[in-house]
A protein has these predicted regions:
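N-terminal accessory beta-strand-rich subdomains and adjacent acidic, glycine-rich linkers
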Residues: 1-165
Length: 166
């Protein structure tokens, strides 16, 4: 038997990699807050505000990355109870916009994080053990399929990104 506690549907390493500035000085992250009576309330945050910044000094700490993460997720059986299962990141310097969505009516997780090499990553998944108490035991010969996800990277901002995803 093999126990599963986390299986990603999509990973993108290197959001806002291009250009001259580090990602934490030029990346805006749009978070899609949602509720039954107040749907699709997108809020824009810069990466530093979400604590996805790099250390500014070299030495004991690691200059250029902080190993922090910022997550939001669906909870329970209502997949959009606090957030929509999607997100947008925009590189203000290069004009690249990254858009993605989880295509699931169940639990899901979206995670941004800083990693070695001065990169910002994104992972998209279904339910996880850490956030949702999810566990799947696979017996020999059994298969597991992750939740579907869609993603696009475009030049030109939010409108072209939304058009590419739809």
């Amino acid at each position: 038997d093999q126990g599963l506690t986390y299986v990603s549907s999509f990973i993108y390493q290197g959001i806002s990699r291009g250009g001259n500035k580090p990602y934490y000085k030029k990346t805006d992250i749009y978070v899609p807050f949602n509720s039954w009576c107040c749907e699709a309330q997108w809020q824009k945050y810069d990466a530093e505000t979400l604590n996805l910044n790099g250390m500014v000094v070299d030495g004991f700490n690691h200059q250029g990355y902080g190993l922090n993460r910022y997550c939001y997720s669906g909870k329970g059986t209502w997949s959009t109870c606090e957030y929509l299962p999607m997100g947008i990141a925009e590189d203000r310097e290069t004009g690249e916009t990254y858009i993605f969505q989880v295509e699931s009516s169940g639990q899901w997780l979206i995670e941004y994080g800083s990693a070695q090499g001065g990169n910002l990553y994104l992972t998209v998944s279904g339910a996880t053990e850490q956030e949702h108490g999810w566990y799947k035991n696979l017996k020999p010969g059994e298969c597991f399929t992750t939740v579907p996800a869609g993603a696009a990277v475009v030049k030109g901002g939010l409108n072209p990104a939304v058009a590419a995803l739809t």
